[in-house]
Amino acid sequence: MSKGKRAPYTRPCDSCSFRKVKCDMKTPCSRCVLNNLKCTNNRIRKKCGPKKIRDRTREAINNLSNKEDPKTNSFIPHFQLDKLQPCLETYQTWYYGIWPVLSISDLNMKITKRDVSAYALACALSAAILNQIDFISNNGTYCIPEDVKKLDFIGECIRARTFMNYQMTPTLETILTSFFLHVAEVNKGSKPAAIIYLREAITMAQIIGLHNESTYKSKPVAEAHRMRKIYFMLMVTERFMCIDDLIPVVLENSIKEFSLDDEQYSVLIDGFKELVKVFSIPSKAIFDRFIQMNDSISMPPETAGLLNKIQLELESICISPVAPDIQKANIIVSKYWMKALTWKITRKNNLLDDFVTTLCVKYPIELSEQFLGEIKSIPLRAFESNGPGVVFKLLSIATVLIDSINLSNDVSGYESLQRMFDLISKLKKTDMIIPRREYDRIKEALTKMEIDIFFSSAQSGGYISEVESNGSLDAFLTDPLVFYSGSNDNPTPSYIPDYQK
């Protein structure tokens, strides 16, 4: 048979066809004879070529042919722009200095053009804003209607992202959507989901190349400026999260900082730039040490010079007097939190040195006094507006202060500890999630201080009522007479520190 000629069609017997073996077409065929089978040809020949189209197949083909670009009106949003606008305006007015990465006017324009990616980003931002202001004891300042607060912005964001298959083509918008979903989830206390969203944002940023300086060379000035802000915002957020949740740091401080000359709101960005410095001064290796602080790995003695350098550079962080209170609170708390962590790692590695101010045992006592002096004019609302992260940082500063007091036996630090505890307790009255172990440790330290003061008063001639026969400490502490010195008949107030300064 010639090479290009097609073999004739054959029809094997029923048995060979069923067994899917070659039939020699004899009657009966040799395989049926060999296997003692009846050789028949009774099966009905099936129709060749295309069959009748099924309704389900027709519908699938129609859906495929009608599929449009995600930016068209094939996606039907559940929320109109008027439902998104209150949260977007709150971001523009109050939170741009914290997350200076979005132009609300540009976002609104894209949403009106049915851009699904912009709509998903607006939903994520709205969820983040609502969960952020939920911690504020009096959030009437933000004027968000009650019906808007009840909307499921996270669910709608996920629906929009699923429609556009966002993972296939990472963009700055998809990065920011993942970031604001992280903010929304962390404020709800959903730590695993929050970590996953932040890691997703970081991965997409690396795919785009935000961690490489070469990426910015071919970009227009405005776009490159925004990209740098996004990268540093991710870096700051990741470094806090990694200490909070003991997860390894990924992002390096690997690109040039952004310029204030390229920014429309330079006052707000100046504060953000100082915040970036707070988290950039310690290297990634130092952050790894922060995370491993509970491990037995020790740092070499020469590291003390590096830790001292970090403390001095953190000391140089300054804040513009015209910066918003929310931004001031964020920067000041972050700065002293980082200084407290640096002292803590110094102590953990036995590198304390009383001849170096920043490395001495009493340094946290000095830090706490400076910290309280810097925040005295900042309203409580500014701390609340920064979300639960501010409480975590305050507790870290306070526990480091307790370590310093215990090591130095310097009770002068108790006044600062009480004032910090007062601030934390006020924040605790909101819906913020308080790390219980650290909170209880501060409470126990202050209780011990009160007992020491009471017994000291007794030894100096003050009146101490008898403890009940069962030795109840509660009975002792609740007896009002322990607060007075002098005679039982005419008690006079003893030393009670004024912690409400």
Swiss-Prot record:
The protein's role, per its UniProt record: Affects sucrose utilization and alpha-glucosidase activity. Probable transcriptional activator.
Pfam family for this entry, one: Zn_clus
Keywords: Activator, DNA-binding, Metal-binding, Nucleus, Transcription, Transcription regulation, Zinc
SMART domains membership: GAL4
A GO MF term: DNA binding
Species this chain originates from: Candida albicans (strain SC5314 / ATCC MYA-2876)
Designated name of the protein: Probable sucrose utilization protein SUC1
Matching InterPro entries: Carb_Metab_Trans_Reg, Transcription_factor_dom_fun, Zn2-C6_fun-type_DNA-bd_sf, Zn2Cys6_DnaBD
Residue ranges of the annotated DNA-binding region, renumbered to this chain: 13-39
Any one Gene Ontology BP term: single-species biofilm formation on inanimate substrate
